[in-house]
């Protein structure tokens, strides 16, 4: 393992088994295109079948690879505009700098962030500064890795309050076929996950979480099976007897269909189950 993942990506393989391939209660459409000059367009829209609320977003991205620059423009149906400029591996190898800003014309709210990330063998370091009206906040994270073992720490410091408002710690072990991840958030929330790639077609995951002072433990298991190169089936269940099912099929190159359902195992005949439909086009 040359470079460890960022703190946010610790345990990502297990989370992906639980989250990818599902879209309960949503009808979703995604479109990705790329022009000849390298300009990338990504648009998405979704409708909530319960609230009938429709949301959408548009993103354009241009990479100036000669100078390690990436320019991104974003817009969503809440009428929030965003601009992101990233420069990577230019000032120093492994160093990534990002300026991220957003503006909402309806409310006049503005936000700006400066994100820095530095990675090299055995180390992944990040520091973000969020410039808020109430006062800047600083979020820092560090992950160390050695022979598959990982240890990470994340903190958030709010200058307006002059105190640390978040303190998280994680430990894990990672190989190509197996991953173990445990974390403690603010000394009160505990979690863990296990990821196992059984073979080329089957992936499994287990997660566990609980809060200090609360006897309610959250537990779930999930699996993803690659039926063939164009189709895969996903399933998951938790200790609340909620059963999730997902099926993804590549109809033709660039067109992908996703069907999903969330069933209440305690009230199978009572209704109230959620269905989802997703279409993804890529050209």
Curated annotation (Swiss-Prot):
One of its GO terms (cellular component) is mitochondrial outer membrane. The modification N6-succinyllysine is found at residue 20. There is a cross-link at residues 12, 20, 53, 61, 109-110, 161, 266, 274 (Glycyl lysine isopeptide (Lys-Gly) (interchain with G-Cter in ubiquitin)). It is found in: Mitochondrion outer membrane; Cell membrane; Membrane raft. Phosphorylation at Ser-193 by NEK1 promotes the closed conformational state preventing excessive mitochondrial membrane permeability and subsequent apoptotic cell death after injury. Phosphorylation by the AKT-GSK3B axis stabilizes the protein probably by preventing ubiquitin-mediated proteasomal degradation. Ubiquitinated. Undergoes monoubiquitination and polyubiquitination by PRKN; monoubiquitination at Lys-274 inhibits apoptosis, whereas polyubiquitination leads to its degradation and promotes mitophagy. Deubiquitinated by USP30. The modification Phosphothreonine is found at residues 19, 107. It catalyses: chloride(in) = chloride(out); K(+)(in) = K(+)(out); ATP(in) = ATP(out); Ca(2+)(in) = Ca(2+)(out). Inhibited by nitric oxide. It is a multi-pass membrane protein. Pfam families: Porin_3 (PF01459). It comes from the Eukaryota. PROSITE patterns: EUKARYOTIC_PORIN (PS00558). NAD(+) binds at residues 242-244, 260-264. The modification Phosphoserine is found at residues 13, 193, 240. The modification Phosphotyrosine is found at residue 67. The record marks 73 as: Involved in ceramide and phosphatidylcholine binding. Critical for channel structural stability and gating. One of its GO terms (molecular function) is ATP binding. Gene3D superfamilies: Porin. The modification N-acetylalanine is found at residue 2. The chain crosses the membrane at residues 26-35, 39-47, 54-64, 69-76, 80-89, 95-104, 111-120, 123-130, 137-145, 150-158, 163-175, 178-185, 189-198, 202-211, 218-227, 231-238, 242-251, 254-263, 273-282. ATP binds at residues 12, 20. Homodimer and homotrimer; in response to cyclic AMP or calcium; oligomerization is required for scramblase activity. Component of the mitochondrial permeability transition pore complex (mPTPC), at least composed of SPG7, VDAC1 and PPIF. Interacts with SPG7, NIPSNAP2 and SLC25A30. Interacts with hexokinases including HK1. The HK1-VDAC1 complex interacts with ATF2. Interacts with BCL2L1. Interacts with BAK1. Interacts with RTL10/BOP (via BH3 domain). Interacts with amyloid-beta and APP; induces VDAC1 dephosphorylation. Interacts with TMEM41B. Interacts with BCAP31. Dicyclohexylcarbodiimide (DCCD) binding on Glu-73 inhibits hexokinase binding in vitro. Belongs to the eukaryotic mitochondrial porin family. Consists mainly of a membrane-spanning beta-barrel formed by 19 beta-strands. The helical N-terminus folds back into the pore opening and plays a role in voltage-gated channel activity. This is Non-selective voltage-gated ion channel VDAC1. It comes from Sus scrofa. The gene is VDAC1.
């Amino acid at each position: 393992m040359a470079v460890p993942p960022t703190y946010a990506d610790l345990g990502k393989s297990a989370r992906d088994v639980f989250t990818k391939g599902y879209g309960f209660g949503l009808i979703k459409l995604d479109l990705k295109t790329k022009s000849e000059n390298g300009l990338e367009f990504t648009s998405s829209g979704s409708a909530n079948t319960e609230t009938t609320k429709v949301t959408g977003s548009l993103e354009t991205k241009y990479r100036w690879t000669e100078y390690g620059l990436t320019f991104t423009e974003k817009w969503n149906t809440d009428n929030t505009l965003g601009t992101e400029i990233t420069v990577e591996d230019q000032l120093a190898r492994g160093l990534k700098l990002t300026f991220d800003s957003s503006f909402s014309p309806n409310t006049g709210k503005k936000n700006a962030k400066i994100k820095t990330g530095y990675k090299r063998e055995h180390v992944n370091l990040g520091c973000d500064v969020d410039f808020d009206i109430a006062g800047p906040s600083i979020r820092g994270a560090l992950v160390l890795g050695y022979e598959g073992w990982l240890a990470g720490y994340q903190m958030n410091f709010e200058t307006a309050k002059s105190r640390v408002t978040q303190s998280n710690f994680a430990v894990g072990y990672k190989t190509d076929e197996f991953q173990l991840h445990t974390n403690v958030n603010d000394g009160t929330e505990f979690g863990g996950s296990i990821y196992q790639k059984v073979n080329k077609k089957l992936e499994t995951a287990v997660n566990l979480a609980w809060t200090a002072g609360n006897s309610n433990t959250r537990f779930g298991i999930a699996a993803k099976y690659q039926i063939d190169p164009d189709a895969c089936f996903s399933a998951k269940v938790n200790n609340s007897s909620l059963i999730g099912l997902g099926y993804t099929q590549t109809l033709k190159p660039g067109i992908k269909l996703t069907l999903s359902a969330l069933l209440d195992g305690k009230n199978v005949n009572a209704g109230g189950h959620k269905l989802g439909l997703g279409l993804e086009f890529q050209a």
